[in-house]
Design a protein with these regions (language model features):
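Surface-exposed interfaces of beta-sheet-rich extracellular modules
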Residues: 1, 17-52
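Short loop/turn and low-complexity linker motifs enriched in small/turn-promoting residues
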Residues: 1-3, 59
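Short, acidic Ser/Thr/Gly-rich low-complexity loop/linker segments typical of extracellular
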Residues: 7-17
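Conserved "repeat-terminator" motif of extracellular CCP/Sushi domains
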Residues: 34, 53-68
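Secretory-pathway extracellular proteins and peptide precursors enriched for disulfide-bonded cysteines
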Residues: 34-39, 56-58, 325, 373
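Predominantly soluble domains enriched in secretory-pathway, periplasmic, or organellar proteins
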Residues: 66-404
Length: 404
């Protein structure tokens, strides 16, 4: 949205010339500025030669809009900080954002962002709080929002933002609950949802929501189950799905959902397995697929599927590797790529992807760095980016990528 002389507003939807509704008298002053930056998609617009005296029709005002780069954020548990980077769309290289690292509460354990990229939320297990930040769309700088940090339960573990951007959910391991918050979409503030917290199994850890936002799933690592809930789209309240909780392998510690919303993948650290479940689109109930479980060995920590849904990846913390798979989008089955797994740093935990699906980023907790890889578009194989190792703080563990 443009404006002239701080009052005459004009919406622009395409390239080309534009004319404001209110004329400027000959010799009068004009001052064209950006009133509102575009949001779908997010762009950063600037005006060149936007002011002067109108001696005739003004034709030299130029508005230039560019998409901001994606940003990557990783929490550092020992340092109580978030390391922040811009992602180069062409090369996948990371560059530290000015002001990084940014302070969090004590022992940050996870970070999540809303789908619009406006807000980020850090679960602080040590201080029992959730730190909330606004994200500068142009620079990626994090700024604490008013009221942050927000109270959470004992040992808050993992958090996630609902696909609508209206709700935030966090597992609280000691209390055996998942806490739900409504997000003020204007300022990012959190308010507990009526009925929150909601009961889980024993020691809930990771959490996932299907892309439609209808169902939420929590892994319970002490009783080896998955709690499944229907999400009220209006209030954010959770209701257990019939048949929940569903059994899984020993010490389920990671969970992800296919971009199609058809399958759930759960990593069981003590078994060295990944369990695959089909989601009933009507009820949210889980059914083990014919190919489940698949054995990975080496203590699988994170399971992730790249954008597009064709390739899956499992971080093996003991072996210091990432295993790559092709994904059958019809059955959900994983088929491991031929050849050895991809080497990483020490104790790879989290893995994330740029929005295009061209690059993967692995957090190496004991190496205190992030390793960047090209994803082969045909096979899904990971190839290390030259010079693509980037320092973060101590005990970095959770990564989120923001952008489009």
């Amino acid at each position: 949205m443009l404006q002239n002389n701080a009052g005459d507003a004009l919406a622009i939807s395409a390239n080309g010339s534009f004319t404001f509704a209110t004329s400027v008298a000959s010799g009068g002053i004009y001052a064209v500025t950006i009133k509102t930056q575009p949001s779908a998609p997010t762009q950063i617009c600037t005006v060149t030669a936007g002011s002067g005296n109108a001696a005739a029709n003004v034709t030299n005002v130029v508005v230039t809009c560019v998409m901001p780069p994606p940003f990557a954020y990783a929490v550092n548990m020992t340092d109580n900080t978030v390391s922040a980077f811009t992602i180069d769309r062409a090369s996948g290289a990371l560059s530290a954002i000015a002001g990084s690292p940014f302070s969090t509460g004590a022992t940050p354990s996870s970070i999540a962002a809303d789908p619009s990229g406006k807000f980020a939320y850090v679960a602080n297990s040590g201080s029992k709080t959730i730190s909330a930040y606004s994200i500068d769309a142009a620079t990626g700088v994090l700024t604490p929002i008013a009221g942050s940090p927000f109270a959470a339960g004992l040992s808050v573990v993992r958090g996630i933002v609902h696909p609508s951007g209206k709700f935030y959910y966090a597992t609280v391991g000691v209390n055996n609950v998942v806490s739900a918050y409504a997000i003020n979409t204007a300022n990012g503030a959190l308010t507990p949802v009526a009925g929150s917290p909601f009961a889980t199994g024993s020691v809930p850890s990771t959490i996932a929501i299907d892309p439609s936002g209808k169902y939420l799933y929590v892994t319970n690592r002490s009783d080896n189950t998955i709690s499944a809930y229907a999400v009220d789209a209006t209030t954010g309240a959770l209701s257990p799905v019939a048949g929940s909780p569903f059994g899984t392998g020993q010490y389920p510690f990671s969970i992800t959902i296919a971009p199609s919303g058809k399958f759930v993948y759960v990593g069981s650290r003590y078994d060295g397995d990944v369990w695959i479940y089909a989601i009933d689109a009507t009820s949210g109930a889980l059914t083990t697929t014919a190919s489940s479980p698949i054995y990975t060995s080496d203590e699988p920590w994170a399971v992730a599927i790249a954008p597009g849904g064709k390739f899956g990846y499992i971080t093996n913390t003991t072996a210091n590797t990432v295993a790559a798979y092709t994904v059958d989008t019809t059955t959900g089955a994983f088929t491991q790529l031929a050849g050895p797994n991809t080497s990483t740093g020490n104790a790879p935990t989290s893995i994330g992807f740029d929005p295009s699906g061209k690059f993967a980023y692995v957090v190496n907790t004991l190496s205190n760095n992030i390793a960047a890889y090209n994803i082969d578009a045909s096979t899904g194989a990971l190839n290390a980016i030259t010079g693509g190792t980037y320092s973060v703080g101590q005990q970095s563990r959770s990564l989120v990528v923001v952008g489009q």
